[in-house]
Every structure is written in C-alpha cells, then in structure tokens.
Amino acid sequence: MNKEIQQANHSKNINKPFTDKDSIRVSVLSEALPYIQRFANKRIVIKYGGSAMADKTLQNAVFRDLALLSSVGVQIVVVHGGGPEINQWLEKLGIKPVFLDGLRITDTETMDVVEMVLTGRVNKQIVSGINNHGRLAVGLCGIDGGLIEARTLGGGSHGLVGEVAKVNTKILSPLLEEGYVPVISSVANSSDGRSHNINADTVAGELAAALGAEKLILLTDTPGILRNENDPSSLIEKIRLSEARELIDQGIVKAGMKPKVECCIRSLAQGVNAAHIIDGRTPHSLLLEVFTDAGIGTMVMGRG
C-alpha cells in the first residue's frame, strides 16, 4: 500500500504545473553556474560578525552558506569576531567595555576574557555549526602554528590591542587544499609572547592579502557603505579604491565602519581582487554576493 501511495504522489508531482516560483528557482540556479565555475578552487576570506552571530536563524543560514560554498569547491577561510558575547561576559564579570576609534581598549583583565570567549566559545560554536552541515571545519587562532604575529597598536593607547605584524599561511594552505574550512579567531601573540586582541576585520584583510584571495567579504550590521549613515537608500553599491580613501578623509566613513573600509583598502592594495561589505542581517547574503549578478552591499574595487 505504501509503495502504491508513493507512486501516486510521484505521478502527481510529475504532472504538477510549472509555476513562476519554479521558474525563479531554475533561473537562480542557472545564474549561479558561471560563478560556481569561476570561484572553484579560488580563495575567499569571510569575516563573520554582527547580528549574523547573535540571531540563531541567521547563524544557521550563514553556516549553510559556508558549507555550500565549500561543497562547490570554493576555498573558504572564516575569520570571526565576537563583540556581543565578549560584552556579555565583561558585564557578568563587572568589567565595563571601552572603545576608542571603533576599537576595544583591552587591559590585561579584559584580554583574558576576550581570549576565553573568542577561542574557547565562539570559535567552537562556528566550527560545530559548519560541521553540522556536512563540511569539516577546523578551529584556529592567530597563535596556532604561528599563523599571525601581533604588534601592539600605536603607542599602546588601546592596551593589548594589536595589529598584524606577520602572517604565516603555511598552516592554512594544506587545510584548504584538502577541503577543510579554517575558522580563525583574532587572538595572536606579539614577539614577546603577550596575547593581543586584533580587530577581526583587520585580520581578515591581512589574511586575504597573504593568501592571494579572490575576494574579501565582511558581514556587517549595515547595508554597506552609506553616504549618510542614517539613510539606507544612500548605499554606495560600487566604489573605487581612491574614492574609499576620500570618504575616510572627508569623515563620511567613521566609527565602526572606518576599520572595515581601511582593511578593505589595505587588502586591495596588496592584490586582493575585490572587497565587499555586506549586510549579514539579510538571510543568505553570502550566496547573494558570490553567486548572483546583482550582488549585495558595497563592492570596493581594487583599481583606481
């Protein structure tokens, strides 16, 4: 009886009219094909942060997107932040977060919390999420394998906040070639062995440059670069490198967006083909950027 029911349902599906929604699905798949072919065996570095980390539905969408990208042969590297969870733990411990120029001021006590949260909690949650969708992710931080060497930022006005002094990609290349997805937290040691908190956008940009990545993609809580930060309709869809610098000089790009645009500029200046600032609050924004003609967010182009 069950077999007869299955056969009947199969016959119904065969005879079911082809709808406009079906046409859209086929069109989307067809549109994706040249991009799948183009980015097979190419490297894309993705900075994962913002609301896409806090909302469970968005989390799952990102993990699925990452698994799909890896499944079709794109060599994915994920660099993650963890600001909201860091703030939650600092609050639990009675430590007030302080920021300067969009970067967290990090004393020794705060650094202990940052390292615990990023490497011990957030990193493993992301690895587990990707693994649950059928791909093999590997959790790392900048300390592992000497991946990143930190240097204290400026004159130490931000405390144990670092910048990237050196990148050693030897640990990453074999993992990527074997189809693993490295998931990297932005904690690294300086030459004197002290742990530093490096802005995750900065780490993503420097890794993209060192790996010769095709793309750098930053997931954010904004539609992209806005000429007016209070007006989503002022989105700049494409911008040249020189124009991005001008927006910083003019004070249009500021606060938390400033380090994001600066890391795009540095990565492009070092050979990355394109950098994208996209809205991680939009479900499957990664796939929309990589596999569609229109893309999403702001594309910063390397020439000009």
UniProtKB/Swiss-Prot annotation:
Q: What is its EC number?
A: 2.7.2.8
Q: Where does substrate bind?
A: 82-83, 104, 197
Name one process (GO BP) from the record.
L-arginine biosynthetic process
Write down a Pfam family by its short name: AA_kinase
Which residues does the annotation list for site: Transition state stabilizer? 47, 260
**Functional pathway:** Amino-acid biosynthesis; L-arginine biosynthesis; N(2)-acetyl-L-ornithine from L-glutamate: step 2/4
**Biological classification of the source:** Bacteria, Bacillati, Cyanobacteriota, Cyanophyceae, Synechococcales
GO molecular function terms listed in the Swiss-Prot or TrEMBL record: acetylglutamate kinase activity; ATP binding
Which PANTHER family does this one have? N-ACETYLGLUTAMATE SYNTHASE (PTHR23342), N-ACETYLGLUTAMATE SYNTHASE, MITOCHONDRIAL (PTHR23342:SF0)
Taxonomic source organism: Prochlorococcus marinus (strain NATL1A)
Q: What is this protein called?
A: Acetylglutamate kinase
Question: Which protein family is named in the record?
Answer: Belongs to the acetylglutamate kinase family. ArgB subfamily.
Tell me where the transmembrane regions lie.
Answer: none
Q: Which GO terms describe its cellular component?
A: cytoplasm
Q: What class of enzyme is it?
A: transferase
Keyword hit for Metal-binding: no
